[in-house]
Amino acid sequence: MAKPALKAAKEALVVKNYELAIEQSKKALSFDANNYNANVFLGVAYFSTKQLSESKEAYLDAIKIDEKAVLAWQGLWNLYESTHDISELHKITPILASKFLELEEQNKCLNTVNKYMEVVKKYGNKADEFKALKLLTPEEGEIYEYLEGRVLPLQTVYMQMVDIQESMDRCYFESEVNKRKTRLGARLEQVMRDVELEIYKDSPLETLYNQIINYAETDEIRRLTESKLLHMYNKLLILSEIKEKSHWRERIWDLIQGMVTLHIPEQAAWTIYFEWQDHSDISFFQSAELQEYIELFPGSPLAQALFAFRNSDLWHKEHPIQLEDSNNSAELAKETKEEDDSENSVDKKENEEDIISSTMMPQDEVLANLTEAYENAPQSTIISECLAKYYIHLKEYEYAIGLSKAALEVLKRLQQDTGVKLDKLTRIFQLCLAIGYSHYEVPRYLFQAMHYYDILLAADPRNYHALLGKGLVQIENEQYSDAVKTLGLLLDDHENDPSLSELSWCYFKTGNLPKAISTVEKCLDVLLSMDVERFKIAEAYYRYGIYILNRKSENYLEDSFSAFVSSLRKDPNYAPAYTSLGLYYRDIHDMVRATKCFQKAFELDASQVEAAEALAKTFAEANEWELVEVISRRVLNTSENDLKRKKKFNWHHTSLGVLELNAKNFHKAIVHFQSALRISPKDTNAWSGLGEAYARSGRYVSALKAFNRASILDPDDWYVKYFIATLEKDMGEYEVAVSTLSEILAVRSKELCVQVSLAETYVRLAKLYHARGFYSRAADSLEKSIQICCNVLKEDITSIFSWEILGDACLSFCQLKNYHNRFPNSLISDILFTTEAMKCANNGRQFENMIYLPDLETSSGAIFIAAVAITCFTIHLSLVADDKLLLPVSWYNLGSSYYRFYECDTTKDATLQVAINCIKQAIKLEAKNYVFWNMLGVLFSQTKAVRSAQHCYIQSLLLNERSSGVWANYGALCIQNHDVECANAAFTRSISIDPDNSQAWLGKAYCSIAVGSIRKAVQIIHHAFEISSGKMPDVNYWYADTMLHAVNTEDFVTTDGDIWSATYAIKRYLGENPTDTFAYYIKASLLEHLGETTDSVPSAIRLCELLEQEYDVSESPVILKRFIDAKALLGRLYLAKKSFENSVEQAGIALDLLEGEEDEDIKRTTLGLNLTCGTASFFLNKLEKSLDCFEKALLVSDSNADVVVLVSKVLWALGSENGKQAAREQLFEALEQSPSHIGSLLCLGAIAIYDEDDAVCSAIEDSIAHLKKDEVLRSGALKQVQIMEVLLTKKIDESMIKSLLQRFLHVYPFAASSWTLLTNRYASKSLANAFATTLYTHPSRPDDLAQSYRLQNSIDRAQVAIHLVPWDSANWKALHGVTHEALVSSDAS
């Protein structure tokens, strides 16, 4: 029943009636569910109608029924092909291909495979392609064998598989590294290693490479694949664990051995072949192998290094050429056989030398090739070995050390990466390190050298090079006994070794002279019988000469001389022998030959320090300092000698320090002296040189330390102490410097340089005293300086610096106007009026057109002193007329002295012109000195030559725009010419350069005054005074003047401290200007405000005397007016002093002088004088006269309220009822005109209390209560107002006193009197604390604050009160009281 359905289904498929075919197939399956063909037909029909899942199911059902049949497999394959299901194709294609193979359907098999390849290539990825290609390999079955010849060859298949795998590995590596490297704590190097290990661990590449090698059709492909396989093995070796490295190492070695054996030109293989073999010398490798490598890879770094090294002088020295091995071996052998006599032997030797020289490269080419090779391949141990050995050969020890260290690191990494351990090669680099350290910067690295020698000897106790090197290091370390033992071990194996010479030296150093001589004699026999370097024989002869010289036997000088000559015959370039010969000739006083020998020794070897020192001394004695410098620098630059401990010399550093010091290279000089002191810390000369270098470079503290150290090492060296004193002087420690110089003179009293320095120090000390206001001390110092200068000039009238210092001292004396009487006129005259001094002043120099000499004999006082200064500087100018360095300064000093003379006598304009000419002359000689231009500007300013002065200041600023003083002077010039804007800019620039320039600040104040900013000017002047510390006279004057103005006008709040500071300032000013009447007036007025009559009265008397003297000379009305003001001031001061009679007298004199004058100023003066006279008369009980004066004052003042109060007081004091009534009336009238006049209110209040007039008391109390706060504070009667209010309140209603005081304190919280009344009346601790806290937080007087602390009734507060006002006995009593109470309470408890 199924057959008809199958037949119908087949026919429907043929006509492509797929629906019918499906129907008939299903019908057939309904009769026979296991019918294979029905399932196949159903799968085909479903596939054709795109019902793929049903088709797949049908094919699978068919395969289950019969797996061996092909149709279902073929249909399923076509289904997967159409859906591009690569994964299923991978599974089914081998099966289908195998089915065709069994059926021997080769074409169908081939077509299936080809289609499979096309689909995979088109729709698959790299992994799919790899899997598809794998089907065509023998490992996958018989398909390749069946289709061989019709598919790709195996070589191609495997190569394509390799390309695909390598591509996949690269993509995986890049993606994984990028992904993992961003993880926290990841290191890129480790990430890359991990990913590479993952790739190579299960990689099929090894198998593929081997298959390519096996099936390769050409040698080129085989070699390329072998190279890849080697690279892979090397990677796996590096990445693998330690236990696995031997496996990969064996594989690599097998691979490269085959390559080398077959002479395959694979560079990596050959390189590993050489690099992995442990060896102690390049000669370990077969020459043919080395030559073959060079020929195979001529451009490689290793080939370059091997070729250069094998053709170097070092190689030929260690491996002498064999003639029979040369290219001309046959011919040379024949010549050798035929020529046996001595003459022919010489020709043979010359022929050998020619052959060697023809094959040898120059040293520079060898080094260049080796260096280039190493730079291109620094990981090559063989290149490092060649270059390190060659560095040692060239004595380039520093490079050898660095290279050997790097090579040892390479070997260490090689062992870590590959497990290859190269012990012999390691010892080669350790030996290079040891040798390098033995010779580089000796003895700095000798410890390291000994360390490596010990390592080498631990591995091989009989290592020749290690024993010899260790022995030499022990000799260098002066361990001669140990060196004897070490060299003895060496000589046990090498009896006739040249090291006998070193052994003899050890015997000599240990004192065994006979053994040393016998050993060196044996050494000479050995050396003369050997073909060794001439240097070795020369050294042995030299040492033999040294031993003979020290034995001092008969004819020892001649024998040692003969040995030294023999040394030079063997090696004419052996420098120590020349040094010894030089010493020999020097001892026999043949200095010409000695010098020649020393020169030759030093030319050959700069480490011959003894020869160098002898040469340096010789040239220094001949003043050939350039040659001394050359020798010293060469010694310094010789590394073999510079750091040797056994030769502790520092003369080269000292001499270079002196040379650099003279060349003004102070930093370099310091370095050299420090180096000298490191070598010899007790070298006094080096300490002195270091101190001088420090001093001349401005580092005075360091210089002082250095000189003090030198002084400790040599206390008797007065020159060091002189330098110390000079430093102390330069540092401003003048008193200490005076003490030091005096100590020197106590021992060496005739040293003129010390006396001159002491005189200069006294002058500087005087200037310091003058700046600090110690004028008497300044005069003392100047007297001593003048005395010393005169003493020096008596010894040497041409002492240049003495004349200069004497002139400077005289100029300083001119400023001490109160002490001119102490100037030693006679002492100066004894010097100046001598014939020798006159000759010095007029020694033939043509200065007549420039210099005007003042008349010393007719001068006196300041003029005489200035004239003496001019004469001193004139003589100084004459003495330095030929000195181009000192002459400009001398002209400047002379010009300054003439300017000082002009300041003392301004009537002599000629002196000012001479001063200008002198400064001009200084500028001609030194036009770039900004100080000279500044001084010329000052002088032109005095002559009103504004343009010239401006030009000079600008020129000075062009030379040095950072000079604050010049800017200040330029500002002063501008303000003198009313250019305020320019002056302000100049002063601002000056302050920006030097913020502590008080003169510039004073100039800023002038500018502020010029533009009307008085308050700002006062602030600036106060700041200028603070920064000047009272040292600037002009600032002192203006500070005191502004303070007096502030006190008189009450424009600014001032304290007693401010007034005391102003008083101090004006006193300092008067100390330098004792005849300034304006300053005396300011001083007396300030003291008047302070209530200090003790000092103010003498100042006012002196003021009157000076003004009287001026008036007698000039009879100027201005002076007369000032004299009257001075008398008025003196009268007030006498009144304050309670010297009433003197007060009346002085006021009377002034009033008499004012008769007939009517202007406003006269009226004010008359008013003050009448008040003074009236008040003084009042206290003298001359009430009538007092009343008369007050009435006159009342008339002059137009019934001024203050005057009315005074008149009322006098009327009341007269005692008559009429007088009292008149007083009341006067006060009422005054209050009508000025209702808030505090004085009138207080006076009338007192009268009302006396009269018990409650109505008036109430009215006065109300008026006082309504007074404005500013009016009370301005009047200065706060305390009186408060007391009056209390009295009036007590009179009216006593119970209101507390509220009154509280209200008063609310308005005036700082009123100490109110707090006192409140505290005394209502005592409490909280009130006392409030009192103290309030005063502490408000500006208050120390006395009031102390009182507040005192009332707190505690020990610590009482102590604070004492600290504030220690002179107040109340504070001490309070402390005593609280202390007593505390003791009593403690006893009671």
From Swiss-Prot:
Q: What Gene3D superfamilies does this protein map onto? A: Tetratricopeptide repeat domain
Question: Where does this polypeptide localize?
Answer: Cytoplasm
**Cystine bridges:** none
Instruction: Share an example GO biological-process annotation for this protein.
Output: nuclear-transcribed mRNA catabolic process, 3'-5' exonucleolytic nonsense-mediated decay
**Signal peptide residue numbers:** none
Q: Which UniProt keywords apply?
A: Cytoplasm, Repeat, TPR repeat
Q: What segment(s) does the record annotate as region Disordered?
A: 326-355
Does this entry carry the keyword Cytoplasm?
yes
A Pfam family reported for this protein in Swiss-Prot or TrEMBL: TPR_22
Q: Which domain of life is it from?
A: Eukaryota
Q: Which GO terms describe its cellular component?
A: cytosol; Ski complex
Report whether Repeat shows up as a keyword of the record.
yes
Q: Which SUPFAM superfamilies match?
A: TPR-like
UniProt TPR repeat ranges: 2-35, 36-69, 90-123, 381-414, 429-463, 465-497, 498-530, 538-574, 575-608, 650-683, 684-717, 719-751, 759-792, 931-963, 964-997, 999-1031, 1124-1157, 1167-1200
Q: Which residues form a coiled coil?
A: none
InterPro entries tied to this protein: Ski3/TTC37, TPR-like_helical_dom_sf, TPR_22, TPR_rpt
Predominant location category:
cytoplasm
Q: What does this protein do?
A: Component of the SKI complex involved in 3'-mRNA degradation pathway.
Q: How does it assemble?
A: Component of the SKI complex composed of at least ski2, ski3 and ski8. The SKI complex interacts with ski7, which makes the link between the SKI complex and the exosome in order to perform mRNA degradation.
Q: What is this protein called?
A: Superkiller protein 3
| Organism name | Schizosaccharomyces pombe (strain 972 / ATCC 24843) (Fission yeast)
Lineage in the entry?
Eukaryota, Fungi, Dikarya, Ascomycota, Taphrinomycotina
